[in-house]
Design a protein with these regions (language model features):
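General small-molecule cofactor/ligand-binding pocket signal
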Residues: 34, 104, 149-152
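Short, ordered coil/turn segments that flank beta-strands lining enzyme active or ligand-binding pockets
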Residues: 37, 63, 110, 153, ...
Length: 174
């Protein structure tokens, strides 16, 4: 289910398992959706909210009127004019790493921002610096590759267990 906190209700469904599992959400009949010029999701759900909702969710629409979430507008790294969606980098790397990690950014004089990888410092892990660099070079577009890898004791998480992006950004600046 796709739920917007602002609506306090669900506005769409998707199958998460089985042969028909999909990353595409199907809005309820009473809900209409569209994209802003920045590709953020705009929701009109008059049965649950009096006003049109403008989200920070970067989305994609398909011909069947379904949508999928690609990431958050506030999780975009602008490196040398190239916009990099943090969640897409993480999703690409997830299947290759054995150690918890997250992507963030740091300021850079030349590029504006650079991609930074924070990884838990687990002694004995197969994820050595050299292996991390090799994986990134093999599976990511060059401009998505982390320019810096920072080992941390624990990844910063919110109280709900989600990545704490603000704290991660601060760690990347050290």
């Amino acid at each position: 289910m796709y739920k917007r906190q602002e609506t306090l209700s669900h506005i769409a469904l998707r199958r998460v398992n089985g042969t028909e599992a999909s990353e595409w959400y199907t809005p309820f009949e009473s809900v209409s959706i569209r994209l802003s010029q920045e590709n953020t999701l705009i929701i009109n759900a008059p049965k649950v909210c009096d006003k049109v909702l403008y989200t920070n969710d970067i989305a994609e629409l398909n011909a069947q009127g379904q949508f999928r979430i690609l990431g958050r507008k506030d999780n975009i790294i602008n490196s040398g004019g190239v916009k990099i969606q943090i969640e897409q980098v993480e999703a690409t790397l997830k299947k290759h790493f054995h150690t918890p990690f997250m992507i963030t950014s740091a300021p850079d004089a030349k590029f504006g921002e650079i991609v930074v990888l924070l990884i838990e410092n687990n002694p004995g892990s197969r994820d050595t610096y050299e292996r991390i660099q090799k994986i990134c070079e093999d599976v990511l577009p060059a401009y998505w590759c982390p320019k810096r890898v920072i080992p941390v004791e624990n990844l910063p998480l919110t109280e709900t267990g989600k990545p704490d992006r603000a704290t991660a950004k601060l760690l990347a600046q050290t």
